[in-house]
A protein has these predicted regions:
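Peripheral, non-cofactor segments flanking catalytic/redox cores
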Residues: 8, 47, 71, 96-114
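Position-driven detector of the extreme protein N-terminus
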Residues: 2, 15, 21, 73, ...
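Amphipathic alpha-helical interaction surfaces
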Residues: 73-76, 91, 95
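Anion-binding and metal-coordination hotspots
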Residues: 78-90, 101-483
Length: 483
């Protein structure tokens, strides 16, 4: 066989449709496509977006369903920037199929994503989030009985060096330069400014005094890793029984937890009402949160309403003084009683696992720990579709056993162990993947006076949430415990 050379190749003058390259298919995106098409996703999106396009005049736009699909790809692939999303979609035949592109169509440019986001209002993005919530609720993934609330930080697309004083518009460097001149240094160097900044007593950057010229809505805050940066505050309301996010709010980073919880709960009630799962006074839902949300005002407002609080209480030195506020005392004591029960302790453990996991998936693995957009409304539009992708991932894990494309493509390892003793014969099947591992145990106990007895134990996600063998029917012939 002769060696082929790149220099000897001649380009094709014509290519038939059958010879054009196409995707062999992706198990995750193909199944997700079936779910979206069966649910009428494109028709719903086009109907919701129709009022914001010209009725007749003008060239037809790119279908808006493609806009939301590309942002879902951003979540599943962990891509933060819209430019990166466009590059990734153009580089994959399977993603081209997921976007429903024809052979001659190109992947929309990243600038089209920005233009479409500016064209479509916030309400359309909320409606898409609600459509996905309705879809997962039809599969029984929204219980609405226990809701966990927590917040995190999202780094804004603005640097601290862009902040200026609200009163006179001076930058931080200009302020230090003026202080140096007042101290007798006519032409201060960079080292002089650093020395003056270190010696300055009042070094706290206050949002009341400073604002960013690049993103005025971003606030100075301390991030989870300890750095001080301009940021936003995403807050989740999560169904603790399934992990579905029922509300994803985005607040200013300088607002405390006790200030933002009312808006997040209002959004959760609205979204749950659309799927007939809203809490009522007769059937309240449990609200589980950490001690950052504990305050007398919050507990008093929620007591006797549609939320039954289980909010962790910080330790206070001494005795509580109520000053005649009997409603606050009753609310605090009722919350403390519910929190101390076994159900309350289990709910707090569940909150720490499920709610924190939602931030890990959306911010860290999903690529939204730092946003590349500016303006709280723009960031929230992108984040709502991002979280909708998270909820679809949970649905996909129910349907095919994998919540991300990487997990679906990862091979599962299977181990078969055979253990034999004088009185027992055991068969152990271990299936492991990136998501965890499961164990199937089948044993045969040999006794002198009997032919034998058998027992079967199934341990899904072994090591994390084991299921006792006593809960599995004995003498089972086949048990499916992984997937």
């Amino acid at each position: 066989m002769a060696m082929g050379r790149e220099s000897d190749r001649q380009g094709d003058l014509m290519v038939s449709w059958a010879e054009m390259p196409r995707s062999p298919g992706h198990v995750f995106y193909d199944r997700l496509q079936e779910v979206l098409i069966a649910g009428g996703f494109d028709l719903f999106v086009e109907t919701a977006c129709q009022p914001y396009y010209a009725p007749k005049m003008g060239a037809p736009s790119v279908p808006p369903g493609r806009y939301f699909r590309m942002h879902m790809v951003g979540y599943f692939e962990g891509i933060a920037s819209e430019r990166g999303i466009a590059w990734r979609c153009a580089d994959s035949h399977s993603l081209r199929d997921f976007l429903r592109l024809e052979n001659r169509e190109e992947v929309p440019d990243h600038s089209w994503l920005s233009k479409t986001r500016r064209r479509l209002p916030h309400e359309v993005h909320e409606s898409v989030f609600g459509w996905v919530l309705q879809l997962v609720a039809e599969q029984g993934l929204v219980k609405g009985k226990r809701i966990g609330v927590d917040a995190s930080t999202m780094e804004a697309n603005a640097a601290l060096r862009t902040i200026v004083r609200r009163d006179d518009g001076r930058t931080y460097r200009e302020m230090l330069t003026q202080m140096a001149k007042e101290s007798g240094i006519e032409t201060p160097t960079a080292d002089d400014l650093v020395r003056i900044d270190r010696a300055r007593k009042s070094k706290k950057l206050s949002n009341e005094d400073w604002i960013s010229k690049t993103d005025p809505q971003a606030k100075i805050a301390k991030l989870k890793d300890g750095r001080t940066h301009l940021a936003y505050k995403p807050e989740h309301a999560v169904d603790l029984d399934t992990g579905i996010i029922v509300a994803a709010a985005l607040h200013p980073a300088d607002n405390g937890d006790t200030t933002t919880i009312a808006g997040t709960l209002s959004a959760a009630e609205k979204n749950l009402a659309q799927i007939d799962a809203a809490p009522t006074k007769d059937k309240p839902s449990e609200l589980v949160a950490d001690k950052g949300y504990h305050s007398r005002a919050v507990l008093k407002d929620l007591n006797g309403g549609v939320w039954k609080t289980r909010i962790a209480e910080p330790k206070h030195p001494g005795f509580s003084r109520w000053h005649g506020d009997d409603k606050a005392r009753a609310a605090v004591y009722a919350n403390r009683t519910r929190l101390g029960s076994g159900v309350g302790k289990e709910a707090m453990r569940r909150r720490a696992e499920i709610v924190e996991r939602s931030f890990a998936h959306n911010l860290d693995r999903g690529g939204m720990r730092r946003t590349w957009l500016r303006g709280r409304e723009n960031v929230h539009k992108r984040y709502l579709v991002h979280v909708a992708g998270h909820n679809l991932g949970i649905l996909m894990r129910l349907l095919i056993g994998a919540g991300t494309p990487r997990e679906a493509a990862a091979p599962a390892l299977t181990y078969l162990l055979f253990i034999y003793t004088e009185q027992t014969v055991a068969l152990i099947l271990v299936v492991a993947s990136d998501d965890g591992f499961a164990i199937l145990v089948m044993s045969l106990m040999i006794q002198p006076d009997q032919t034998g007895t058998s027992a079967t134990g199934c341990y899904p996600n072994a090591g994390l949430d084991p299921m006792p063998a006593s809960e599995i029917p004995k003498a089972a012939h086949a048990v499916e415990c992984f997937g």
